[in-house]
């Protein structure tokens, strides 16, 4: 079965709240049917992105968790959070009907099965290399014989798969395993979210993160394709959360104030 503790989830959090304790929903019935067809809003949380999700002994926190809970409050439904350790696993899980909403970067491959809102946060994808590496710029990396560690199915994996002309990608199950593989397998570079790479490099003075970026990763909310009423509601919800300062305040609480809030969708 695809959904296993070891291969798919870091953990599963059930944050189910009695419906009677929820405020009355102002959402139309067709929206609730799309976003909570079981009566519970099932939210997929990608713990592979440290900008959006932070973990501690009490569970998961961060802007995606805050947005999921706020959406459930708007809908007047209970909520169940399922935590995955990589974005690629969230995308795979939609095929099994495991979630109703997710927080993923907008990518063409994902858009074949997921309807996306406009982004709420924009983060950078870049490279980490050895401190003494001859690779100095983003352009230097795309050369014959260069091997790059990536988390399988991540936004940067999908982007680099489309755009690289010469370098080869070496895929690992999750971002942490990708960085471990980069070191253990003596690869030339590791791709990832800048904040995650910076945190890793701080513990490894023999590593450095490139100041340039190869990708602006547009983080958005999504729902399985075909839930049109639900998607339109999500689009409005995301714009409201950006305009009200909800997203900015959530990121600040999470220690991610340097993340860039996406502009309003025109």
Predicted regions and their residues:
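Extracytoplasmic small-molecule ligand-binding "clamshell" domains
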Residues: 23-105, 110, 244, 253
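Extended ligand-binding regions for polar small-molecule ligands
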Residues: 24-29, 62-74, 133, 139, ...
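Short loop->beta-strand "edge-of-pocket" segments that line small-molecule binding or catalytic clefts
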Residues: 40-47, 61, 139-154, 168-169
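Alpha-to-beta junction loops
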Residues: 41-42, 76-78, 95-104, 145-147, ...
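Periplasmic-binding protein-like
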Residues: 47, 122-129, 194, 198-239, ...
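Short helix-initiation/N-cap motifs at beta->coil->alpha
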Residues: 81-92, 135-136, 170-181, 217
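A ligand-binding cleft/hinge motif common to bilobed small-molecule-binding domains
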Residues: 88, 105-113, 159-162, 183-184, ...
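Flexible hinge/capping segments at coil-to-helix
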Residues: 120, 129-147
């Amino acid at each position: 079965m695809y959904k296993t503790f070891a291969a798919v989830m870091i953990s599963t959090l059930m944050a189910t709240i009695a419906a009677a304790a929820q405020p009355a929903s102002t959402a139309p019935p067709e929206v609730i049917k799309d976003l909570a067809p079981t009566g519970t809003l099932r939210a997929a949380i990608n713990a592979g992105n440290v900008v959006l999700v932070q973990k501690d002994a009490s569970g998961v926190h961060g802007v995606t968790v805050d947005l999921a809970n706020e959406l459930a409050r708007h809908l007047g439904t209970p909520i169940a959070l399922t935590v995955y350790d990589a974005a690629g696993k969230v995308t795979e899980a939609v095929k099994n009907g495991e979630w109703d909403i997710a927080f993923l970067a907008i990518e063409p491959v994902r858009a074949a099965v997921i309807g996306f809102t406009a982004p709420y946060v924009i983060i950078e994808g870049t490279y980490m290399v050895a401190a003494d590496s001859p690779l100095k710029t983003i352009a230097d990396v795309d050369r014959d014989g260069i091997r790059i560690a990536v988390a399988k199915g991540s936004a940067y994996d999908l982007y680099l798969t489309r755009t690289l002309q010469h370098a080869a990608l070496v895929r690992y199950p999750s971002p942490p395993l990708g960085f471990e593989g980069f070191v253990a397998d003596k690869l030339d570079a590791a791709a990832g979210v800048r904040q995650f790479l910076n945190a890793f490099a701080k513990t490894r003075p023999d590593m450095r993160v490139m100041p340039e970026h190869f990708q602006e990763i547009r983080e958005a909310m999504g729902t399985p394709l075909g839930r049109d009423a639900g998607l339109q509601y999500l689009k409005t919800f995301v714009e409201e959360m950006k305009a009200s300062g909800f997203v900015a305040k959530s990121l600040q609480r999470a220690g991610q104030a340097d993340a860039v809030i996406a502009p309003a969708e025109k």
